[in-house]
């Protein structure tokens, strides 16, 4: 197995550098072939590592950065005026081929702007897309994109997203001929806006896609499709709604379990079942949205991720680097262009 190097934006996120550094050390223990580049405030990073790391010091390096992209920074201003930020540094290492991928929990808009500026999109790709996996009723994963990189998408962009999502499902989830669907307000072909209808025709005409038609929002978790395509506006709302529902259910179970003695007894008896359910829907294991369609690998972690959640984002970056996802997407897009020429 070839050695991999990841660049981490240590200063990104809501919970402080210690969360990311803790996840980083766990990743180094999990992946013997992995090296890491820590981009951020050297004093802060060194101070924490001196207290927690010893045997792994030969597998990471620190690149000092004088700036940090804040969560409320304007993306365009961050792109122009924070070139020495930890986020820009991590992306730069991918651009210079000093790292195979980068991971950041920072400002999504700034990450998108900097990644597009430095890495550029693959030939034949109009816009990159944010994609993440979600659990299904049968214990599988469904890939949903776009999650907000492009608010409005024309039919061509939706077609490209379908191809990119299909490649990701093949390479990361190991699914042969992934079932691809478009998120719509109904399953009938007469429903939906013009760009959705046109995209449906384009997907159906492609030999490179296993297109199954439209699905509705309540079908996302029903294991009907392996890849669901939508524009960034609808995709982001769908994702945030799902995350909010999971949090509501978890909190409701906790609250009900404390209501009275009978509830406590029933909760204790049901604990093995609840634990299995939680492991399946735990948001931590679905942390790590990939910014695909670029000439390099960029993975976006939740800003409020725990160290375990950030570790999942690192795992996603490792998998994509091992399977050379950008190259596979490039090849598939080229085949699509040849098919349509």
Swiss-Prot record:
Protein's cellular compartments: Cytoplasm
Pathway entry: Lipid metabolism; phospholipid metabolism
Example of a GO cellular component annotation carried by this entry: cytoplasm
Major localization class: cytoplasm
Keyword Lipid metabolism: yes
Keywords (A to Z) from UniProt: Cytoplasm, Lipid biosynthesis, Lipid metabolism, Phospholipid biosynthesis, Phospholipid metabolism, Transferase
A Pfam family of this chain: FA_synthesis
BP-aspect Gene Ontology terms: fatty acid biosynthetic process; phospholipid biosynthetic process
Source superkingdom: Bacteria
GO MF annotations, alphabetized: phosphate:acyl-[acyl carrier protein] acyltransferase activity
Subunit architecture: Homodimer. Probably interacts with PlsY.
Function: Catalyzes the reversible formation of acyl-phosphate (acyl-PO(4)) from acyl-[acyl-carrier-protein] (acyl-ACP). This enzyme utilizes acyl-ACP as fatty acyl donor, but not acyl-CoA.
PANTHER family in the record: FATTY ACID/PHOSPHOLIPID SYNTHESIS PROTEIN PLSX, PHOSPHATE ACYLTRANSFERASE
Name under which the protein is recorded: Phosphate acyltransferase
Highest classification ranks of the organism: Bacteria, Pseudomonadati, Pseudomonadota, Gammaproteobacteria, Alteromonadales
Gene from which this protein is expressed: plsX
């Amino acid at each position: 197995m070839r050695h991999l190097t990841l660049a981490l934006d240590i200063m990104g996120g809501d919970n402080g550098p210690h969360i990311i550094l803790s996840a980083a050390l766990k990743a180094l223990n999990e992946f013997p072939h992995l090296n890491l580049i820590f981009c951020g405030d050297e004093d802060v990073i060194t101070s924490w590592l001196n207290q927690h790391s010893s045997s792994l010091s030969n597998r990471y390096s620190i690149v000092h950065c004088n700036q940090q992209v804040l969560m409320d920074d304007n993306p365009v201003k961050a792109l122009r005026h924070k070139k020495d930020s930890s986020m820009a540094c991590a992306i730069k290492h991918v651009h210079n081929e000093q790292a195979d991928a980068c991971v950041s929990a920072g400002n999504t808009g700034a990450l998108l702007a900097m990644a597009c500026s430095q890495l550029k999109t693959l030939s034949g790709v109009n816009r990159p897309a944010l994609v993440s996996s979600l659990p299904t009723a049968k214990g599988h994963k469904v890939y949903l994109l776009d999650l907000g990189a492009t608010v409005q998408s024309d039919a061509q962009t939706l077609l490209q997203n379908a191809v990119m999502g299909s490649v990701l499902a093949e390479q990361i989830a190991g699914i042969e001929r992934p079932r691809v669907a478009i998120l719509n307000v109904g399953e009938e072909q007469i429903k939906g806006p013009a760009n959705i209808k046109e995209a449906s025709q384009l997907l159906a005409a492609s030999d490179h896609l296993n297109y199954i038609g439209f699905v509705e929002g309540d079908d996302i978790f029903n294991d009907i499709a392996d890849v669901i395509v939508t524009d960034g506006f609808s995709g982001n709302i769908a994702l945030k709604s799902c995350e909010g529902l999971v949090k509501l259910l978890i909190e409701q179970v906790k609250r009900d379990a404390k209501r009275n003695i009978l509830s406590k007894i029933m909760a204790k008896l049901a604990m093995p079942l609840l634990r299995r359910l939680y492991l399946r829907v735990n948001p931590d294991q679905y942390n790590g949205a990939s910014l695909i369609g670029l000439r390099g690998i960029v993975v976006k972690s939740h800003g409020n991720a725990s160290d375990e959640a950030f570790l999942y984002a690192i795992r996603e970056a490792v998998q994509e680097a091992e399977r050379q996802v950008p190259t596979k997407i490039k090849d598939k897009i080229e085949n699509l262009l040849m098919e349509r020429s």
